[in-house]
A protein has these predicted regions:
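Positively charged, small/polar-rich N-terminal and surface patches that mediate targeting and assembly
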Residues: 1-108
Length: 108
């Protein structure tokens, strides 16, 4: 049985997010994407940083996460970017079936 997950990725540029979304969907690596504008605060080289960011959430099969990471790396401007894989442990069978039917992952 396939394992499913949501991946959270933070960006600082909306156009970068849009290019990434288009590529992920075109390659059939994700079934859906949501973008949320947020204010983030973090430590970077022992200094506190605060900035507007865009959080991208994608739904996919866990076995495609490496391909997704490699594709995001092509579009992402951050030296070190958030790529948090969150298992989907409880949802409807119909939702998982929808992800399964939409996500295929083209070969690179």
């Amino acid at each position: 049985m396939d394992e499913y997950c949501m991946i959270e990725i933070a960006f600082d540029d909306l156009e970068e997010v849009k290019r990434t979304i288009n590529a992920l969907l075109e390659e059939k690596l994700v079934s859906s994407c949501q973008v949320i504008e947020s204010e983030s605060t973090w430590l970077w080289h022992q200094e506190v940083e605060t900035a507007q960011e865009y959080l991208l959430f994608v739904k996919t099969k866990k076995n495609l996460s490496t391909k997704i990471y490699n594709l995001v790396r092509k579009y992402h401007s951050y030296e070190t970017f958030e790529f948090a894989i969150i298992p989907i442990t409880s949802t409807s069978k119909n939702y998982l079936s929808w992800i399964n039917n939409e996500v295929r992952g083209k070969e690179y």
